[in-house]
Regions:
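Glycine-rich anion/phosphate-binding loop at the beta-strand->alpha-helix junction
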Residues: 141-157
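Alpha-helical scaffold segments in soluble metabolic enzymes
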Residues: 44-52, 95, 99, 122-125, ...
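Active-site diphosphate/adenylate-binding microenvironment
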Residues: 15, 23-86
C-alpha cells in the first residue's frame, strides 16, 4: 500500500480545540479502502471524538489486527503510536502495551472476522480482564480483504456479491428452535 500524505495547509480560520489542534491534526493518510464499506465513517467518527475530547494525538496508542480494519488506523491520528498485530491477537497485545505504559490512551480497532472468529477468545478475555481501552469492532459481515467470504457475524440468509446465500448452521445456536427454521 502506498502511503499518501494529506497536504498540511491550515487555513487561519480553522476552528481549534482547547489544545490548539485543528480537526486536520487528528487525520492520517488518505484512505485506500473501498468506497462505501463504512470503515471510513468509523475513522471520521474517531477523528471527531478525539478532536472534541481534546485528546493529544501523541498520547494515543492505536492497535489493530488483520483485515480491512487493520488499515483504518493509518487514516486517523497520524501523530499517534500505532501497531498492527497478527490475526485475532490485538486484544492481548493491547493488554501488554497497557500494562507496560499506563499513561497512554489505548484504542483497539478490529474487524468482525478478527474479533468474532480467530480472535474471539482474545476478545472475551480482554472484556473479562476489564482492560482500560476502547475496543471498536468494524462489522461488515465479510472477510473483505479476501474478497467477501461470509464472516462469523454474517446474517443467515444474506447473499454475497456473487449471489451465494449464507447457509451457516451456527444460527441454530441462537435463533432457531429447529433446523428447518434456519435459512
Amino acid at each position: 500500500m502506498t502511503y499518501i500524505a494529506k497536504p498540511k495547509f491550515h487555513h487561519p480560520a480553522l476552528p481549534t480545540n482547547a489544545l490548539g489542534f485543528t480537526h486536520r491534526d487528528y487525520e492520517g493518510a488518505i484512505s485506500t479502502l473501498c468506497a462505501g464499506c463504512g470503515h471510513d465513517s468509523i475513522s471520521a467518527a474517531i477523528i471527531q471524538a478525539c478532536f472534541e475530547l481534546d485528546l493529544p494525538p501523541h498520547r494515543v496508542a492505536k492497535l489493530s489486527g488483520i483485515g480491512c480494519s487493520s488499515k483504518t488506523p493509518t487514516y486517523f491520528l497520524g501523530s499517534s503510536h500505532g501497531f498492527n498485530t497478527v490475526h485475532g491477537r490485538m486484544p492481548s497485545v493491547l493488554t501488554g502495551a497497557n500494562l507496560a505504559n499506563r499513561d497512554l490512551i489505548y484504542l483497539g480497532v478490529s474487524g468482525d472476522g478478527d474479533s468474532a472468529s480467530i480472535g474471539f477468545g482474545q476478545f472475551a478475555h480482554a472484556i473479562r480482564r476489564g482492560v482500560n481501552m476502547v475496543y471498536i469492532v468494524e462489522n461488515n459481515g465479510v472477510y473483505g480483504l479476501t474478497k467477501g467470504q461470509f464472516s462469523a457475524t454474517s446474517d443467515p440468509g444474506s447473499k454475497s456479491k456473487r449471489g451465494v446465500v449464507n447457509h451457516d448452521q451456527s444460527c441454530l445456536l441462537y435463533t432457531s428452535p429447529s433446523p428447518r427454521d434456519c435459512s
